[in-house]
A protein has these predicted regions:
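Short, small-residue-biased leader/transition segments that mark boundaries at the very start
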Residues: 1-2
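Conserved SAM-binding strand-loop segment of SAM-dependent methyltransferases
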Residues: 10-27
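Glycine/Thr-rich phosphate-binding loops of Rossmann-like dinucleotide-binding domains
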Residues: 25, 44, 73
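Hydrophobic beta-strand segment of the Class I
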Residues: 34-35
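Short catalytic micro-motifs in class I SAM-dependent methyltransferases
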Residues: 38-41
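Conserved catalytic/acceptor-binding region of the Class I
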Residues: 47-48, 54-111
């Protein structure tokens, strides 16, 4: 709600959606820019999420991601907490993997 009110105050015509990054309700090549700030990294199925990101951004469009890295402070916290928590569901990727450039390149392939 805060973002909506800030956009309206600035006269920006922005539409905000909340949905499932693994199954976005948008057409192919619909956006010039697709961005995720600490969002897509929590999708359990990294391949499905990356496929959707690549599908909805137009050819030549931009994809911007902000994600935690495995080597930073949050990565250290994940390692520590991981010793005391049950493992993630089978097949679920670590959110920290999105902070690894090689992983993201592999997910997106030639996209």
């Amino acid at each position: 709600m805060l973002f909506r009110s800030q956009a309206a105050e600035r006269g920006l015509h922005i539409h905000f959606d909340v949905g499932d990054v693994e199954a976005m309700p948008y057409g192919d090549d619909q956006f010039d820019v697709v961005s995720s700030t600490f969002g897509v990294m929590f999708a359990p199925n990294h391949s499905a999420a990356a496929g959707e990101l690549a599908r909805v951004v137009r050819p030549g469009g931009r994809l911007g991601l902000a994600c935690w890295t495995p080597d930073g402070g949050v990565g250290d916290m994940f390692k520590l907490l991981g010793r005391f928590q049950p493992p993630p569901p089978e097949g679920a990727g670590s959110p920290l993997a999105w902070g690894n450039e090689a992983h993201v390149r592999e997910l997106l392939g030639g996209a």
